[in-house]
């Protein structure tokens, strides 16, 4: 970052120093000024004041290039007025259509701007100011600030500017107070809107969580119901299969009992037949014995 020294009075420093007027220093800072003007050459010093700034280059050609490239440029919604510090502009526009510095960016600029003008006004003499033409009745167009030049005494100018500065400062103080109140109200409204949005988001999140829990519970209940129904079906199936097996076993047992009864009957018949045959043989033997006797 460049130094803050921009008040050297040697001819080389004067010719390589750039004055930047009508600068919105409420927004534009020293780093911003250095970033804008460093593209024209090495910056030896940079100082930012209320409403204006100085940029000190190492070489005069760099300063002239910066004046040619940046004069009349729009910086932070204001058209800047740029010239060499050693060559102030004689006439800075139409006095009938210009806006005061207090209306554009605050009354404190008048004091600092005129101090700079008085600082260099004592070293150089300029022709008297040209009388302004009649004011235009059409739309007022803002133009560059007109610099008052002449061979008047510094005491008279400083006294006049201090009075105008006091009047402008009271007006700007009221304007700033109103602006601060308006900004405060807007910020309060924005905060209320943000709070309401956050509350709505929290409600939506709670509803989503509640719905998710309900869906999860419903799914678990469905799973339990399906599992219990499956178990019931399996149990019924097993009971039906078990009953069929029991009936089959009972049928087998009945068949076995019938078979055993039939076998016993057959054995008894066979025994009866054998017994009858033995009795027949005994009868025949007795008959034969009687015949022999």
Swiss-Prot record:
Where mainly located? nucleus
Supply the InterPro entries for this chain: hnRNP_C, Nucleotide-bd_a/b_plait_sf, RBD_domain_sf, RRM_dom, RRM_HNRPC/RALY_subfam
Q: Which UniProt keywords apply?
A: Coiled coil, Nucleus, RNA-binding
A cellular component term from Gene Ontology for this protein is: nucleus
Q: Region labeled Disordered — which residues?
A: 140-177, 208-293
One function term, GO molecular function aspect: RNA binding
Annotated RRM domain ranges read 16-87
Q: Does the keyword RNA-binding apply?
A: yes
| Listed Gene3D superfamilies | 3.30.70.330
Q: Can you tell me which residues the record assigns to a coiled coil? A: 177-208
Q: Where along the chain is composition biased (Basic and acidic residues)? A: 208-222, 229-240, 269-293
Comp. bias (Acidic residues): 242-263
Q: What are the subcellular locations of this protein?
A: Nucleus
Q: Which family does it belong to?
A: Belongs to the RRM HNRPC family. RALY subfamily.
Q: What is this protein called?
A: Heterogeneous nuclear ribonucleoprotein C-like 3
- Whichever gene encodes this chain, its name is HNRNPCL3
